[in-house]
UniProtKB/Swiss-Prot annotation:
Cell compartments where the protein resides: Cell inner membrane
Function field: NDH-1 shuttles electrons from NADH, via FMN and iron-sulfur (Fe-S) centers, to quinones in the respiratory chain. The immediate electron acceptor for the enzyme in this species is believed to be ubiquinone. Couples the redox reaction to proton translocation (for every two electrons transferred, four hydrogen ions are translocated across the cytoplasmic membrane), and thus conserves the redox energy in a proton gradient.
PANTHER family in UniProt: NADH DEHYDROGENASE [UBIQUINONE] IRON-SULFUR PROTEIN 2, MITOCHONDRIAL (PTHR11993:SF10), NADH-UBIQUINONE OXIDOREDUCTASE 49 KDA SUBUNIT (PTHR11993)
Name of the protein in its database record: NADH-quinone oxidoreductase subunit D
Source organism per UniProt: Gluconacetobacter diazotrophicus (strain ATCC 49037 / DSM 5601 / CCUG 37298 / CIP 103539 / LMG 7603 / PAl5)
Similarity comment: family membership: Belongs to the complex I 49 kDa subunit family.
Length: 416
């Protein structure tokens, strides 16, 4: 291979070290420019569109654009009976559907003035914690993918499949379960499911250890997350944070402990709290919460006794199918429930649950009819999304991707 020969006619001033070359290498000020991030980008976690004002590779401002997944859910609920309104909640935060159902079911029960059987409460608590683990596995592995770690995602989807099978065994559906109903749950656990869940709960902590062996002390992972997207305690409270994002900033607030619902007052668990409030702390909080959720699942299995799984008022819950074959009254109840629904006394309530992403609330107004007069939904991710601008400033573009992943945003509930 021959050496490269410069053309003989090139002036010496243009060669390296010449006057013209020196003049061409002076420093140029880079003007700020706009960069559209999403909604097609895989790191946008759905349909997030960010308009980033960049100064070179540094984020000067981040403007989130919402509404691309708006379906008018709150208005649609006003035209449905209470039983038919419930499935809409599965489609809000579609990563943790049963926790969304739980909020609406509790709100409706509060307006009806009913108390569900003890076994139904234990089933709800157990599946709410299974849902929390489902959510955190997906978030942590997706965050790993955003930062370049592929292996956790492969392990995570394999582990999530086991939990989705529990969903399917209990409700008949893998995702949109429609399982938590006002008055209890739709049906009892099938034979053998409790043993399968107990066996999974025994081995799951070892899976968490494997996940941490890949990430927690990995120096590349820490370089991508430590000190990135810091939010102080004062900022988190001022911006309306909740859930893991709030606890990562040092506030030990958890609705399961502060305002217990169903049977959360009968289980023991710790509330993980961090101090720094960065992406790494939000990761650690979710890892610790998965360990606590397994503890709660095991306590539910230990304390769950045989019994009814819904109230016996068949104007609110459907009668057993065996009764419908021999009782005209049961058949009428079933027909009326799934056509006209039931009438809820006039009143209003705000009911919130500790969903995997934070406080998910339902403000439900009843006017005495068989349809909600108003159903205002308090999504968990809306407050977190609005803080992206504050969190991302003065960070590199690649850090903005890690910040978005650590906030655990799902636009089904944000856009509604």
């Amino acid at each position: 291979m021959s050496d490269i020969v410069l053309h003989e006619d090139i002036p010496e001033s243009l060669l390296p070290g010449g006057e013209a070359a020196a003049a061409a290498t002076h420093t140029v000020e880079i003007d700020s420019h706009a960069l559209n991030f999403g909604p097609q980008h895989p790191s946008a976690h759905g349909v997030l569109r960010l308009v980033l004002e960049m100064e070179g590779e540094v984020v000067a401002r981040a403007i989130p654009h919402i509404g691309l997944l708006h379906r008018g859910t709150e208005k649609l609920i006003e035209y449905k009976t209470y039983p038919k309104a419930l499935p809409y909640f599965d489609r809000l935060d579609y990563v943790s559907p049963m926790c969304e159902e739980q909020a609406f079911a509790l709100a409706t029960e509060k307006l009806l003035g009913i108390d569900i059987p003890d076994r139904a409460k234990w089933i709800r608590v157990m599946f709410a914690e299974i849902t929390r683990i489902l959510n955190h596995i997906l978030n942590l592995t997706a965050l790993g993918l955003d930062c370049g770690a592929v292996t956790p995602a492969l392990w995570g989807y394999e582990e999530r499949e086991k939990l989705i099978e529990f969903y399917e065994a209990a409700s008949g559906a893998r995702f949109h379960a429609n399982y938590f109903r006002p008055g209890g749950v739709s049906r009892d656990l099938p034979a053998g499911l409790e043993d399968r869940i107990a066996e999974w709960a025994r081995q799951f902590p070892a899976w968490i250890d494997d996940l941490e062996s890949l990430l927690t002390n990995n120096r590349i992972w820490k370089q991508r997350t430590v000190g990135i997207g810091i939010f102080t305690t004062e900022q988190a409270l001022a911006w309306g944070f909740s859930g893991p994002c709030l606890r990562a900033s040092g506030v030990p607030w958890d609705l399961r402990r502060a305002q217990p619902y169903d049977n959360y007052d009968k289980v023991e668990f710790n509330i993980p709290v961090a101090r720094q409030g960065d992406c790494y702390d939000r990761y650690l909080i979710r890892v610790a919460e998965m360990r606590e959720s397994v503890r709660i699942v095991e306590q539910c299995l230990a304390q769950m006794k045989p019994g009814p799984i819904k109230i016996q008022d068949h104007k609110i819950t459907p009668p057993p199918r065996r009764e419908m074959k021999r009782s005209m009254e049961a058949l009428i109840h079933h027909f009326k429930l799934f056509t006209e629904g039931y009438h809820v006394p006039p009143g209003a309530t705000y009911t919130a649950v500790e969903s995997p992403k934070g406080e998910f609330g339902v403000y439900l107004v009843a006017d005495g009819s068989n349809r909600p007069y108003r159903c205002k939904i308090r999504p968990t991710g809306f407050a977190h999304l609005q803080a992206i601008d504050e969190m991302s400033r003065r960070h590199m573009l690649a850090d903005a991707v890690a910040i978005i992943g650590s906030l655990d945003l799902v636009f089904g509930e944000i856009d509604r």
